[in-house]
């Protein structure tokens, strides 16, 4: 019985120590840090963002030259792209917004024209296109509407010229294209993952 109680106490102490150690490590790597890229030694090494040769956790921002206007804001966790990224036109008008999770593109990738009108809405899941992706020309006319599943074209695919006339309109069924392709080089879509 003493052996059992001793073992239970040892396990309890070990669990508490491990939990505290894990919490301390997590706190140390997720402290909010925001730095100007021009003020630090920032490098990308094999896809890992480093500041002063260590994997970076925090926010990196860039300014337009000779201004205080933000050009870009990126977030990293342990050197990997993580969280929201934003790019701006001069004058702080939003140009792009996207999300990463542990180095992979996730969620919506949104792009705007300098006028503030929507230019693109692409959706990602685990680093590849997922769902409906759309593009508009600067005057607001829809010029592309594509559907994806796990990075592959699927279902209805449509594209228009800038004047609104149809460019291509086809369906993907069983990995093959049917309809108006609007291309000269037909490629088997079952071999094409879009990222």
Please provide the spans of the model-predicted regions.
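Bacterial Sec-dependent N-terminal signal peptides
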Residues: 1-29
């Amino acid at each position: 019985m003493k052996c059992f109680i001793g073992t239970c106490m040892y396990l309890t102490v070990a669990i508490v120590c491990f939990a505290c150690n894990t919490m301390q490590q997590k706190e140390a790597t997720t402290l909010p840090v925001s730095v100007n890229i021009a003020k630090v030694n920032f490098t990308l090494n094999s896809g890992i963002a480093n500041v002063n040769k260590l994997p970076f956790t925090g926010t990196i921002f860039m300014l337009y030259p000779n201004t205080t206007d933000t050009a870009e804001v990126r977030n990293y966790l342990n050197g990997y792209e993580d969280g929201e990224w934003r790019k701006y036109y001069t004058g702080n008008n939003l140009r792009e917004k996207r999300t990463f999770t542990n180095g992979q593109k996730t969620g919506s990738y949104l792009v705007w024209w300098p006028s503030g009108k929507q230019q693109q809405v692409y959706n990602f899941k685990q680093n590849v296109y997922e769902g409906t992706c759309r593009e508009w020309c600067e005057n607001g006319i829809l010029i592309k509407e594509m559907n994806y599943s796990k990075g592959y074209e699927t279902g209805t695919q449509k594209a228009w010229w800038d004047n609104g006339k149809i460019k291509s309109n086809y369906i993907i069924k069983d990995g093959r294209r049917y309809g108006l392709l609007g291309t000269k080089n037909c490629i088997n879509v079952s071999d094409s993952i879009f990222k």
